[in-house]
Amino acid sequence: MENTIMENNVLFGKHLIACGDSFTAGDFTRWTDSEGRAAKESPLVYDSEWGCYKTFPWWIARRNNMKLTNLAKCGGTIAISKEHLADPENVEIGSRHPFALETYKNLGDDVDYILIMYGLNDMYHTNLGTIDDETNETFYGAFNVVYKYLITKYPFAKIGAIVCNAYLSDEYAEAVRETAVKWGIPYLDLMKDTGISTTLNKKGMCDEAREIRNAQFHVNENNKHPNHKAHELMSTYVDDFLRRI
């Protein structure tokens, strides 16, 4: 039976690399579990064996016996920050952990699946740019730089983009879609796809529905990041997405 499950599960034993910001890395600040344990002290939200929060990539990896490398950083962007571009002497180039600076070149050789979800910090801290940009100094350009490199370096890896479903502006969401289409990268649109459940936000939701969902899936009133239930739910449809790309 175990061999049958392994043979029929395309994700089983594969290496998943997750790239993004705090919505992928996990942010449970100002939160405690029912026993008063905070964040990394609580087994409810933190895996001490793997040294990472139990965000949606963790759920996928644990469920399918995958190797997980979570490269997401709280506050992270894909492009170099406009603060650094405006004042390079006083703002470090790596202050926002820009994925398109060096990280995308350092994924190693053992790569099966790559998930990329950026935009929430970029819309405040990076320049949008245009679809024709070929620079890591704009949001559009950073995706172009990263995708060109990844499909060249890893021709047989499965690469997928995610349009985040929380607070992302229309312009930055559209940039994620357009660059994915440009480079032939499949994407999961959490903002517009009506065929999946929502956790925090979705295009067209009424204010009442959004208020109910936010109360259910925010860490708490003082932390608007996804809670552990939101990550578990999100993992189910990202899992399905990975199986289709």
What does each model-found stretch correspond to?
Residues I17, T69, K158-G160:
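A structural signal for isolated positions on well-ordered beta-strands in alpha/beta enzyme cores
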Residues M1-N3, Y118-G119:
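Charged, low-complexity intrinsically disordered tails and linkers
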Residues N3-W50:
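Short glycine-rich His-centered loop
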